[in-house]
């Protein structure tokens, strides 16, 4: 189920303040955030947002196709290293 239309999209207040400040100053520096649940809005297009994946911040450049998705979708939290082969070998 999606979020109710009357509530609107979720975006962290601190992230919104940083974006508005950068848009007023025409600044495009990297914004660091821990808010993976924030929805990408049209005002974010062209910005680079460093999203925390639990270990480090992953820079994500926002494009038009990303609008409506969550920031956390573009910063994977798990790394798959592959299945370990059996060390004993065949009998």
UniProtKB/Swiss-Prot annotation:
GO biological process terms held by the UniProt record: ribosomal small subunit assembly; translation
UniProt xrefs under Pfam families: Ribosomal_S19
Record GO cellular component, one term: cytoplasm
Gene3D superfamilies: 30s Ribosomal Protein S19, Chain A
A molecular-function term among this protein's GO annotations: structural constituent of ribosome
InterPro entries, alphabetized: Ribosomal_uS19, Ribosomal_uS19_bac-type, Ribosomal_uS19_CS, Ribosomal_uS19_SF
Keywords for the protein's UniProt record, in alphabetical order: Ribonucleoprotein, Ribosomal protein, RNA-binding, rRNA-binding
PROSITE patterns, per database record: RIBOSOMAL_S19
PANTHER family assigned: RIBOSOMAL PROTEIN S19P FAMILY MEMBER, SMALL RIBOSOMAL SUBUNIT PROTEIN US19M
Function as written in the Swiss-Prot or TrEMBL entry: Protein S19 forms a complex with S13 that binds strongly to the 16S ribosomal RNA.
Sequence similarity: Belongs to the universal ribosomal protein uS19 family.
Protein name listed in UniProt: Small ribosomal subunit protein uS19
Native source organism of the sequence: Synechococcus sp. (strain CC9902)
